[in-house]
Amino acid sequence: MNAKIENINGITNITKKKGVPLKILQLTDIHIGGSFSTRKKDKLALQAVEKIVNASDADFVIVTGDMVYPIPWLLQGSFNNLKSSKKFAACMEKLGKPWTVVFGNHDSEVWATANKKKIGDFYASCKNCYFSHGDENVTGDGNYHISVLNEDGTLNTVLMFIDSNAYLTWNFFSGFDIIHDDQIEWYKNTIKIIGAECGKKPEEVNSLAFFHIPPKEFREAWEKFYRGDKSVIYHHGFVGEKDNYFGYPKTVEGKFFNEMVKFGSCKGMFMGHDHLNTLSLTYKGIRLTYGMSVDYLAYKGIDKRHTERGGTIIEIYDDGTFDTKMLPLDDIEHKSFFETGR
C-alpha cells in the first residue's frame, strides 16, 4: 500500500507517499441480481471484480453506483437489494482493499425491500468501506468527502462523493434526476471550508467528483470533439451505446457542470450509468470520464460483450494533478492465460 487511510471522528483522510502516485480504482455498474436465476451472471460479475481489483494494485477502490440490480421482471433480479448488496460487499471485504461507493439509480428501486438509508447503513458497517451518509439536510444519501493529503500533511486533493439521485418521480419512465442545487451548494461550501483551513482559495483546492448519472455536457463535449473542436481534449475510450447514447437527464436542466466550471475547484468528474461508454475527455477545464463497467446482467446480450468491461485507474500525483487509464478485463485475463495457462 502506498497510502495510509484514517477515519477520525467521522472524517476520513488518505495520506499518500511522497513520490508515489495514489492509485485509485474506479469500478461501476456491477449489477448483482441476487436471485436464483441470476446466480451464474452474478458469479461472473463478482469474479470480474476480484480479477480487476487484484490486477489494479490500487490503494483505494471507488464504485460509482448500481452495485445491485433489483429488477424482478424479465431479468429476474431479486426484490431483496440488501441481500444483493451483501453479496457485493462480501466480495470487496474479502479482497481487503479500502473501498467506498456512491448510489446509482438502481441501488434502491421503488419496489426493492431496502431504501438507500438501510443500504448505506450496511455499507458503512463494513470493516473496509468508507461510505458516509453525509449531511441529511442535503438532497440524496451519500454526499460526503475524503481528503487526500501529502506525506507532509498538506492538502493534495478532495474526493467528493455525490448522490446523483435516480428518477424525477418514482420510476424509470419519468426520466433521470439531476444533482440538485443544494448538493451543488454543499460541494462549494465543503471546498470553501477545507480551503480556509489550509489558507487556499476555492479554485486552489483540487477536487474530483464521483457520481453515477452523467451531465448533459458530456454529450456536448463529445459532439464538439467529433466535429473537430480542438478545445476538447481526447484521452481514451469510446462511445459504445447505440445511437451514441448518453444517459443524462433529458427533461430537467442540471446546473452542476457549469457551476463547477465557474467555481474552479473541480478538475475531474467520474461516472458510470452508460455501460458501453468508456470515453474520457477534457472540456472547459474538467476531465469527464466514464468508468469501464462490469455488468453481465442489465443489458441484453452484454454477457457476451468484452470491450466495455474492466476498471479505470486514477493516479494522483504529489502536485495534485492526475491521470487516468483503462484497465480492461480482457487484458487481465489474457495476461493471466499467457503467464499461467489458465
Predicted segments — roles?
Residues 37-41, 72-81, 111-114, 172-176, ...:
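Short, flexible/disordered intra-domain loops and linkers
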Residues 2-16, 78, 82-202, 296, ...:
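Extended active-site neighborhood of metal-dependent phosphoesterases/phosphodiesterases
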Residues 21-34, 156-166, 210, 287-293:
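Active-site-proximal beta-strand elements of phosphoester/diester hydrolases
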Residues 33-36, 69-72, 101-113, 167-170, ...:
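Active-site environment of divalent metal-dependent phosphoester hydrolases
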Residues 29, 49, 61, 66, ...:
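Divalent metal-coordination and catalytic microenvironments
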Residues 2-5, 145-153, 255-263, 275-342:
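Binuclear metal-dependent phosphoesterase catalytic core
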Residues 1-82, 87:
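N-terminal active-site segment of His-dependent metallophosphoesterases
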Residues 56-60, 158-161, 173-274:
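His/acidic metal-ligating clusters that form di-metal
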